[in-house]
């Protein structure tokens, strides 16, 4: 039976699962009925529209005057060349927002994304096909790579580039797919709560977890206009569950710490899955982990201190037992799924 309350239930649990380099699953709960979809839908839209990516916005091909032209010695006409070019996902290696990259190829050659890698750009889908030129052909072209968000049609790009370039539709978003599911979750014998399960796939320009963080930042920034004028108290009291929201990061995977392969593999073999497990350990317990060397120990200590949970500190205080129970529960659920 639902109790009468004066504030909404505060969700405090989050699970971050890195399925692959470009796919992640993020779960948050418990939400009161109606709150989950209210948050999930705009977050999904923001993943597509606010995540920063890179795209070619203009191309200039030697000997070609317009997009409906053809080029001697190239299998594709210019229109198909442009279609293939837009499918190649560029990533600028520096902090610049725009770069002009020049390429020159002599035939015979099949050109793919891997051939476009250089000191300025990285191609995150190197197997993508671009064009084929015969033995008598030479292909020289320049591409303008731009940093941006969302989608911008070529008509608007036209005003941003030089007249001798062909303007391209720009698909900046690196998010290929973002879906969410709502599942029921039990809270104190009450089944009328929900969890949000996001599955995010990116193209490799940014990782899925980074993309999700960026969309959350975008939502906070957009909402801040109300806080400034209406004097909103973001720390207003709300109902919460066992592990406090301020410690929610401790329920994230140790993969989030971006440790070296040696350190991560050592933790993995010791079946340490969550950041909270490290926060509960002192230095001697860490030293006792099999095959954990001095460098790995120092790395873990440095990372834990950086996120606010120094090894051996008493930051958690009265939350330790609750955290142990929650981690045990999560591990049990993981084992059941396996």
From Swiss-Prot:
Positions of the UniProt region annotated as Alpha C-terminal domain (alpha-CTD): 246-338
Region spans: Alpha N-terminal domain (alpha-NTD): 1-227
EC number: 2.7.7.6
UniProt keyword Isomerase present: no
GO cellular-component term (any): DNA-directed RNA polymerase complex
Top enzyme category: transferase
Family designation: Belongs to the RNA polymerase alpha chain family.
Entry comment, domain topic: The N-terminal domain is essential for RNAP assembly and basal transcription, whereas the C-terminal domain is involved in interaction with transcriptional regulators and with upstream promoter elements.
NCBIfam families given in the database record: PRK05182.2-3, PRK05182.2-5, rpoA
UniProt name for this protein: DNA-directed RNA polymerase subunit alpha
Provenance organism: Campylobacter curvus (strain 525.92)
